[in-house]
Amino acid sequence: MGLWGGRFINESNKLFKEFNRSLSFDYILAEEDVISSVAWSKILMKSKIITEKEQITIESALFELLKEIKENNQKILKSKCEDIHSWIEEKLIQKIGILGKKLHTGRSRNDQITTDLKLWCRKKIHLLLENIIELQKTFILSAESNHNIIMPGYTHLQRAQPITFSYWCLAYVEMFRRDFSRLKDVLKRLNVSPLGSAALSGTAWKINREELALSMGFDSATNNALDTVSDRDYVVELLSSASISMMHLSRFSEDIIFFNSGEADFIELSDTITSGSSLMPQKKNPDALELIRAKCGRVHGSLISILVILKSLPLSYNKDMQEDKEGLFDSIKTWNDCLCMAILVLKNMQIKNESCRKAAEEGYSNATEIADYLVKKGIAFREAHNISGQLVLRAISEKKSLNELKLSVFQMYSNLIKNDIYKNITLESCLEKRMSKGGVAPSQVYEEIIKAKKRLNIF
């Protein structure tokens, strides 16, 4: 059934009809369309546009339809309807006859679709927030159970300074904490109701939009109908949040892929989250992580797409905005899938203590400690930095670690260096001295774990 056509003489071209249809993807909004339609029927009754008996009949039929949708929403795709709105209306009319044609009074598909989309986004945001919390919890528990593992920290993918695996975990807790905060902000701005804005200038019927908004769980109604039906900022914001979080997931994946490689050998991934090679029997591939890394680009592409779609669009609604959904639907599913997979990976990997420590010991990651030691002896940092660099060069030439150099060698570069140099350049000393807020000192890390557990209600 078409929702328009009275002013047309000729029927739409078959190819155009197919090109114009959105049911193949907006069928996902079926439940939301029913929910908003029920709310609309109630406000029509309160405005005395339909009777109480008519409203009860409409609501009953819509909930009956909702039950059918939940049982199998794929059957919607067999229809030739233009979109989900026309499909719902067609089914409603089939159930209750001409009364079903009253439901669209005072409503436009322009405010209807953005209401449905906001309801869908809100539902998905709550699910995403839960999984972001779960991912943070998994990092915290991993940090707590591997608190004593020392490993190299990297800059430019070269060993820089010693850190702990717990500290590495906490870095990602901070990233996903920001993701959580961003997503909550999206929800705050998204949660205003468009319904009742009609096509672009509001409705001529006496509708209490604030009451309507509250009935659907919105905080309030929007303030300007022209802006309301034009607005897809919430889609941009949601995809922006998704893109940033996916970037964090991609960085996490790259770290683990490297840690799992034969070159690092810091961790062992479980058989349950890896795959093999059809040719090379020795291979154990981190496919889950590689897919997360790749899917990041897919989500970023959807963000760019919606920005380009909305660029230069005149007010108010334009058919271009039909293209806001496929990328959004795909990206939100992708983001959620990747969050779940990251949780699974973290729960199914073993940290190799000895390999991590060996790498930290071999990379001259304690060189900064020599410079700091000399500064405490009264040497300017730039000069101390130079002396430390010369000692690293000497150690490399002798194929030794800094700890293995003789005191006499140290004193060739500065007579201020005494026997206490050795206790100052142990890995443990490197960690313990970094007591500044956010530092790697075990006591600081432990304190942050306790704070995070309290914040996330981990008992």
Curated annotation (Swiss-Prot):
It is found in: Cytoplasm. GO terms for cellular component: cytosol. Belongs to the lyase 1 family. Argininosuccinate lyase subfamily. Its EC number is 4.3.2.1. Keywords: Amino-acid biosynthesis, Arginine biosynthesis, Cytoplasm, Lyase. Pathway: Amino-acid biosynthesis; L-arginine biosynthesis; L-arginine from L-ornithine and carbamoyl phosphate: step 3/3. One of its GO terms (biological process) is arginine biosynthetic process via ornithine. It is an enzyme of class 4 (lyase). It comes from the Bacteria. This is Argininosuccinate lyase. One of its GO terms (molecular function) is argininosuccinate lyase activity. InterPro entries: Arg_succ_lyase_C, Argininosuccinate_lyase, Fumarase/histidase_N, Fumarate_lyase_CS, Fumarate_lyase_fam, Fumarate_lyase_N, L-Aspartase-like. It catalyses: 2-(N(omega)-L-arginino)succinate = fumarate + L-arginine. The gene is argH. Signal peptide: none annotated.
